[in-house]
Amino acid sequence: MRLIIVSGRSGSGKSTALDVLEDHGYYCIDNLPAGLLPELAERALIHTELAQPLVAVSIDARNLPSHLSRFPELLEEVRSRHIQCDVLYLDADEETLLKRFSETRRRHPLSSANRSLAEAIHDETQLLGPIVDLADLKVNTTNLNLYQLRDTIKLRLLNQPEPGTAFLVESFGFKRGMPVDADLVFDVRCLPNPYWKPELRAQSGLDAPVAEYLAAQPDVEEMFQDISSYLLKWLPRFAASNRAYVTIAIGCTGGHHRSVYLTERLGQVLQKSLKNVQVRHRDLS
């Protein structure tokens, strides 16, 4: 059995995550009382007609505070039944959450006549502390649109061919901000930039002319060797420490040339030594 627990602050994309999981065969329950987690897992194991039952539930601030405070022990009880259980925590910065509620005119579940939206978001953050501390995968949706969020859920949660640590090597551009959910960040802006070659500007690190240009630069090769040596040495230690997800982010200025080229090469090297290695280019349209 596989159980995915979806949590996060209101407005961060939990409904979208459940929709994606439901589309991929998961039996989904929104706003499950946390105290029912062990019972749900037990019943799913006993009564399911599926050889590999797939269940997803959302648990958030609509729960009783006493149930949320018990989340660590409830999660431990579920996992003691040898159930594959992943906790997905979605979030966004406060300004984005405020904007989303303003645009949709939805009411925050904790807001009231005596509690402003900002105060409700603050209180929600405190209530969800026991869950965020135990999250296996944290996804910040501040800069993600609906389609990007759906793709991220599918990539990180549904495309794992084997159990174990899921590694994501991701390129990005600093001008759009660092990925806040990255575990390791490498800044490669010091390398020669193909952007300043007019014939290469419109291409990306996936295109042969850009790759050939970068491959001929000694500094690029030295950077690649240093990063790959570091990752090959230390990523197995992350896996040995029972980390479910590890994100490695490679950043250049725009996220189109240097970071893309290095991310592709690093992904190829890591896929030869590690299981569950995925590659993503955040800022390529």
UniProtKB/Swiss-Prot annotation:
GTP binds at D60, A61, R62, N63. One of its GO terms (molecular function) is ATP binding. The keyword Membrane does not apply. The keyword ATP-binding applies. It holds the Pfam family RapZ-like_N. ATP binds at G8, R9, S10, G11, S12, G13, K14, S15. Keywords: ATP-binding, GTP-binding, Nucleotide-binding. Displays ATPase and GTPase activities. Belongs to the RapZ-like family. PANTHER family: RNASE ADAPTER PROTEIN RAPZ. This is Nucleotide-binding protein PFL_0912. It comes from Pseudomonas fluorescens (strain ATCC BAA-477 / NRRL B-23932 / Pf-5).
